[in-house]
């Protein structure tokens, strides 16, 4: 019976040792789980902050693109109006030169009658 008692004591010691090892492994796993949950929370906060920042950047970008489009429209309209003014100025200059030429011809002395043959 002593042999059985010794075996039972040995089994009991091994069971206690295995239970202690399992408890240690569980505690280590709990520590790892807590670390990963902390990391998860930190990452979720970063994602939230980055998402908010991205939304602000997108809003600013949309406003700036709209402003740029307004600049483009204004510049295009101004350039078109300026080209019309330039064309009108060119036309006005041509008309003025032609009229000035006509006036010069109309007011010039008659060169045919005073060609110097009468002298």
Swiss-Prot record:
GO-annotated cellular components: axon; axoneme; centriole; centrosome; ciliary basal body; cytosol; midbody; motile cilium
Tissue spec. comment: Widely expressed.
Region of interest: Important for localization to the centrosome: 2-32
Source organism, top-level taxon: Eukaryota
Coiled coil: 13-70
InterPro entries: SSNA1_fam (IPR033362)
GO molecular function annotations of the record: identical protein binding; microtubule binding
Record key words, sorted: Acetylation, Cell cycle, Cell division, Cell projection, Cilium, Coiled coil, Cytoplasm, Cytoskeleton, Flagellum, Neurogenesis, Nucleus
Cellular localisation: Nucleus; Cytoplasm, Cytoskeleton, Microtubule organizing center, Centrosome; Cytoplasm, Cytoskeleton, Microtubule organizing center, Centrosome, Centriole; Midbody
UniProt GO BP: axon arborization; axon extension; axonogenesis; cell division; intraciliary transport; microtubule cytoskeleton organization; microtubule nucleation; receptor clustering
List of residues that carry N-acetylthreonine: 2
Entry similarity comment: Belongs to the SSNA1 family.
Function of the molecule: Microtubule-binding protein which stabilizes dynamic microtubules by slowing growth and shrinkage at both plus and minus ends and serves as a sensor of microtubule damage, protecting microtubules from the microtubule-severing enzyme SPAST. Induces microtubule branching which is mediated by the formation of long SSNA1 fibrils which guide microtubule protofilaments to split apart from the mother microtubule and form daughter microtubules. Plays a role in axon outgrowth and branching. Required for cell division.
Complex and partners: Self-associates to form fibrils. Also forms dimers as well as monomers. Interacts with SPAST.
The protein's name: Microtubule nucleation factor SSNA1
């Amino acid at each position: 019976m002593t042999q059985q008692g010794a075996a039972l004591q040995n089994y009991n010691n091994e069971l206690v040792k295995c239970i202690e090892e399992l408890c240690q492994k569980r505690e280590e796993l709990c520590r790892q789980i807590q670390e990963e949950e902390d990391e998860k929370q930190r990452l979720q906060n970063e994602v939230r902050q980055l998402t908010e920042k991205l939304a602000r950047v997108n809003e600013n970008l949309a406003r700036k693109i709209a402003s740029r489009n307004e600049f483009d429209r204004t510049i295009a309209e101004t350039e078109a109006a300026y080209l019309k003014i330039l064309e009108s100025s060119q036309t006005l200059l041509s008309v003025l030169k032609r009229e000035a030429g006509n006036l010069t011809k109309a007011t010039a002395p008659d060169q045919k009658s005073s060609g110097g043959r009468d002298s």
